[in-house]
Amino acid sequence: MKTGFSRNKLKYSVNEKFFDTWTSQMTYVLGFTFADGNIYKTSLGWDLQEKDKEILLKIKKAILATYPIKFRRSSYRLRISNRILIDGAIRKGLLPKKNIRNELPNIPTQYLRHFVRGYLD
């Protein structure tokens, strides 16, 4: 089955294992993504207002991404097309449609505050 991904022609890179291990940084990004991110057909992405570009820069740095942040219609966009990264986010409870995200993922207690911080940013 074709998924739109080609491992041979990767133009950009990212830490594919970012969502594999609970850390404060990973949990913050997960929380932020629950609130303001989305899983699209072939990418994990965030579209934010101009004033929030700094958050996208932090996420990009945290996940070691070389993907560009693009400006479009008065907002900044970061889209990561990497099936392994997306599958890791899904395993942590991130669902493709925001409107069906009605449960928090099972987060270890010591990281819960980082999830909330990301969610509220």
Question: Where do the PLM segments sit?
Answer:
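Intein-associated homing endonuclease modules of the LAGLIDADG/DOD-type, together
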Residues: 2-121
